């Protein structure tokens, strides 16, 4: 062991841990310096998360929460109390994990980071509202301001002062004119023409008119101030607080209002307040879409599911021969419009398609219906149309099942009223420096940041906005510093990847400016390109410099080298881990012989660059043309089959859109018959070389404690068959079901096969206590009497994969699957370990193992999204071996990855970029790693050059 003896100090600069035994920790003692950047590293499963999250964070949070009242505690999720003798020097803890943010469609990047709240405040305090129709600013002027505005015109300009009295109203207005004459007025302007009051022509009764009373006619001179003031006062009195000054020679009009309103149409707003700009408040949200920005509609492309078929044979589900009532309507339409119900839908004239889908309008059609009794009856009415029919049924039904069914024909589109802005009309026409809020929110963060940095307001507006602007620009700056410059504030939070969501939380934490806190982060570098790594590390150091302890579980080499202190866990994983190998500075860790991390840091061990690359076979290519989802710019992707291809590029360059949203969904639809809707593309060639596609992601293998590696990989069934075949089982008549803990029979009924009983504690975390009847064994006594090679079913579930591999050596169906779990480096997990306790990286490798154990055709396309998440250098070497085996059988592997060790070993690279967001979405480079390293504009190439030397 390398030196890591805890000092016996009682200073305030150390977090002292004594006797930590959480999960697989082996009673460890450890001192960690406070207010430093500490990286916890080690193999996958070596106990990093157990130390950082389940011990340090859990205890820090628990102590803080316990200081609250019992009433407040019941609303907080309490962590389990870690199994540890003593922890001293803890601060209140905040964890920033990789869970995706909320699944609430109302959450956006702006609301999650609270920038939107500051923007609402800014627009409410210094925004200028405009009239949506006349595009004039709403403003109120005093009489003296109106006079000054007229006096600013060139001297001797002839001006007519008018009072706008009638706007867009029908009528003859005879009495109105008589009334004006009685009040002593001489002239009026009717529909733009000026008349003497006694010469006004007779007005058309059914046409809308505009009438202004002429109050005064003046030439602009300095000495007419008093006269103008009196004229304006009269005009305001008669013109409903509005007045109009018209230059008589040019006809140009200057509108004035004494009320806060549009001088032309009197459109006015109550006082601007922040909630007018909130799409989550009825006062601000667009009434059509309720502030969601999009509406559901019945999509003709989904309604006509099979355009190649005829209406009679099922072009439109539910309207073909099998549905007599609806099909009779179609036949009557065919008679009326003269088309053939047996003709393919795509060959029908556009007019016919329009009538069938959207109805006949006012045109009446003769319908003939045949009742079930065989009687014929006729009806004449307009045809509703299939889409209006679906809309009506969707509105009127009370059945959730019918709604679910109808939803299959729906799609989203931007809301027709607000165009996706989410806000009501009034809020969309309030401007700051000429820009409305929804436009600013749709820009990439770099542009938004620049706009507010250079925003120049005048007078007291500047003073009001100063503090708000400081908050906005700072927070935007933090988001840009964690590599999220390509996002925009209106981006929905549910579309963010785990890494993006985590970095947004990180930026929000810096924005909150807390000090004296212990932050625990889980691999913040996930999904980040090497280029943005330095900015992320600078952000972490900034958190530390505010006076916080920053503890990061991380495998990234740069992060380990930049840390103030490194804790290396190991030596193995699971049972073989849980010890601290060394806790010291990065330099000393690199010197440590026993530490695998140290060996990789010092260069004693490394992942080798392959000596030769597998050549590309031009006859076996998968070509995807014209991909244009999200920010992709009409991309054509060429994938050589039978090789390992890495898709690289900075965050937000379009990798996930191209692979997960386009390629994976097209191939799943064509090869696996999945109901997937890919992002827009033109064409795909080369699918004949493949027979299935498998997307191996990091989602959990099961969400309940009953799901475990044995059930997921299908190991458990042959194991139960072995137990059912034991002579004693046969004698008692036990079958395979007897050995399942999910059904009655063999399981312990007291805990229903869970092995633990949940006790609700209300103010404290729920406690799981071992079942008193079976003592956590999950089965009843009779079942446990059955033994195979001296072990019962519960003891088998408690074995690690490694132990089970030896135990079942003679049973090929079982040992083959166990061997693949060993191959992906999961020898340490227990067969019955609850799926909920597996990390994302472990879950992904269980899936890989399952794929490896299947019989193989060698024509599979595997898609992996950042498989190195949660993996140490040594684990990556193992993963590359497994992927190499898949390739060896002739399969094709596509990996989205930022890790240079994986990228340098690929046969082919497709690099997207050059930037994220709008600045990305193009293929910058493609070819072998050596070829990509030579491409000037490629960031990936720049970093590859260094590792390929």
From Swiss-Prot:
A cellular component annotation (GO) from this entry: excinuclease repair complex
NCBIfam families, A to Z: PRK00349.1, uvra
Location(s) in or outside the cell: Cytoplasm
UniProt similarity note: Belongs to the ABC transporter superfamily. UvrA family.
GO biological processes: nucleotide-excision repair; SOS response
Highest rank taxon of the organism: Bacteria
Record function comment: The UvrABC repair system catalyzes the recognition and processing of DNA lesions. UvrA is an ATPase and a DNA-binding protein. A damage recognition complex composed of 2 UvrA and 2 UvrB subunits scans DNA for abnormalities. When the presence of a lesion has been verified by UvrB, the UvrA molecules dissociate.
Record bears the keyword Isomerase: no
Keywords on record: ATP-binding, Cytoplasm, DNA damage, DNA excision, DNA repair, DNA-binding, Excision nuclease, Metal-binding, Nucleotide-binding, Repeat, SOS response, Zinc, Zinc-finger
Signal sequence region: none
The keyword Glycoprotein is assigned to this record: no
Zinc finger residue extent: C4-type: 262-289, 748-774
Binding site for ATP: 42-49, 649-656
Quaternary structure, from the entry: Forms a heterotetramer with UvrB during the search for lesions.
Protein name: UvrABC system protein A
Domain ABC transporter: 319-596, 616-945
Naturally occurring in which organism (per UniProt): Neisseria meningitidis serogroup B (strain ATCC BAA-335 / MC58)
Primary location: cytoplasm
GO MF entries: ATP binding; ATP hydrolysis activity; DNA binding; excinuclease ABC activity; zinc ion binding
InterPro entries in UniProt: ABC_transporter-like_ATP-bd, ABC_transporter-like_CS, ATP_grasp_subdomain_1, P-loop_NTPase, UvrA, UvrA_DNA-bd, UvrA_inter
Classification via PROSITE patterns: ABC_TRANSPORTER_1, ABC_TRANSPORTER_2
